[in-house]
Curated annotation (Swiss-Prot):
This is Cell division protein FtsB. It comes from the Bacteria. Part of a complex composed of FtsB, FtsL and FtsQ. It holds the Pfam family DivIC. InterPro entries: Cell_div_FtsB, FtsL/DivIC. The chain crosses the membrane at residues 4-21. It is found in: Cell inner membrane. Keywords: Cell cycle, Cell division, Cell inner membrane, Cell membrane, Coiled coil, Membrane, Transmembrane, Transmembrane helix. It comes from Vibrio campbellii (strain ATCC BAA-1116). Residues 1-3 are cytoplasmic. GO terms for biological process: FtsZ-dependent cytokinesis. It is a single-pass type II membrane protein. The keyword Endoplasmic reticulum does not apply.
Length: 93
């Protein structure tokens, strides 16, 4: 019986050691948890940067569209290959 208790104590000690210090143990868990937190911060910064770039792209696209629309309506400009038709109300003449 004494050998059995010693064997169980050794087994329990080995299990505790592997739990706290072994591969995929508690120390590895905390290390990975810290790495995840750092990576999430990096991802947040990159996501914010991407959102800013998408907003800038949308502004540039809409800006060009707005400039083109203004040139068409106010200045009567047309693109190559297009034909411009102006419909005039009879009341204006």
């Amino acid at each position: 019986m004494r050998i059995f208790v010693i064997a169980l104590t050794l087994l329990f000690g080995w299990l505790q050691y592997t739990l706290w210090f072994g591969k995929n143990g508690v120390s590895d868990y905390y290390t990975v948890e810290d790495e995840i937190e750092v990576q999430q911060q990096v991802n947040s910064k990159l996501q914010a940067r991407n959102n800013e770039m998408f907003a800038e792209i949308d502004d540039l696209r809409q800006g060009l569209d707005a400039i083109e629309e203004r040139a068409r309506h106010e200045l009567g400009l047309v693109k190559d290959g297009e034909t411009f038709y102006r419909i005039v109300d009879e009341e204006e003449h």
